[in-house]
Amino acid sequence: MRDAPPLKPPAVRPGDRLAVVAPASPFPRGAFEAGVGELRRLGFAPEFDAGVFDRRRYVAGEAAARARALMAAWLDPGIPAILAARGGYGSVELLPFLSVDAMRRLPKLFVGYSDLTALLGFLTTRC
């Protein structure tokens, strides 16, 4: 559990860079591209690495690679928010690879749904 009070990340504004990561299940590329297009239409600058399209059975790539992508986005001071491309099974696999201390030093908004519960719980209680 976290001993310190929760940190409030900054609000996002049009023009901000937003990272899109795939911490859990893979997704249809067309739906992803439509979502990225909508973020652009709203004035944001979505960013993602090519690994977001990886697939390994029922998850979006190797756990260590998904965690590296999340940590890279989290540690980028120019990115105020991170969006999960999709929920689904697999987010719990990232937890051993995440750095609480590093994440706590740079509060971010993290947006996700469905079965990102393990990751959202980790961020809420530890970061």
Where are these regions (language model features)?
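ATP/NTP phosphate-donor binding region
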Residues: 1-78
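Active-site histidine-anchored catalytic micro-motif
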Residues: 40, 59-127
